[in-house]
Amino acid sequence: SSVTGTGTELKFRTGGDQGTYYGFGSVLAQAITTNGNGTKVTAVVSNGSQDNIEQMQMNVAQLGFVQSDVMSYAYNGERLFEGFPYADFSTVAALYMEQVQIVTCDPDIKSVADLEGKTVSIGASGSGVYYNALDILAAYDLTEDDINAQYQDFGASADALQDGKIDAAFVVAGAPTVAITTLATAKDTYLVGLDDEHIAKLQESSPYYEEYIIPEGTYE
C-alpha cells in the first residue's frame, strides 16, 4: 500500500477526538477496511470541516467529513476560503443532518431577536459555527457587534451556560448533542427557534440551510 494514500491506504479526516465526527468516522473507517476488498481506511483526528478540506487539497488525506455550508465556501472561494477557491473534490455521501441549535438557560430568551445585548457564544472565530451564527443573526438584522460575543467550543459553552457566565450559545451538531444533554441534566435548558418569516429570509441568502424541527423530548 502507499503511504501517500494513492493506492489502497486512505486517510479519513474526521474531527476532534471527543466529537461525533471522530467516533462516527472511526466506525466507518473500520467498516470500509473490513469490507473494502483490500482498501485500508484510517480515521484521523482533525480540527473539523475547514481543516479537512485543506488537508485533502494537499493530499494529506483522501476522505473527510465536511459540513455542506463549509463545502459551499470552499467551492465558491468565500468566507473561510476567501480568495482561495477549492473545487477539486466530490461528494461521496450525505450522512446526516446537523442542526444549528441555539441554547439558553434563560426562559425569557424566546427569539433570536432577544439575543441583542446578551452574552452569546458563537463558536471559534472563523469556524463553521461562527458563520452559522452570523447568518442567523443577520436574518434578524443583528450583527456580531449587537451581542457580547464569546468564542467557545461546545463543552466550554455548556459549562459557561451552567455557571451563568453567558446567556446563550450556538451549537452546530446532530441532536441530541452530548454537551446539551449534560447541561440539561443540571439546569433547565431551552432551545430557541426561528419563525417562518426569518427562516425564509435565511434561506434566501444562504440556500444550504433547511428547516428542521428538533423532536420534543430530545433533551429529556
Give the location of each predicted region.
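Pocket-lining segment of extracytoplasmic ligand-binding domains
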Residues: 68-70, 78-79, 144-220
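Residues that cap or initiate secondary-structure elements
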Residues: 18, 49, 69-70, 108, ...
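Extracytoplasmic
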Residues: 7, 36-38, 48-51, 58, ...
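N-terminal Sec signal peptide cleavage junction
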Residues: 1-2
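A structural signal for short loop-to-beta-strand junctions that line the ligand-binding cleft
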Residues: 82-95, 218-220
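Bilobed "Venus flytrap"/periplasmic-binding protein-like clamshell domains
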Residues: 7-35, 39-40, 97-163
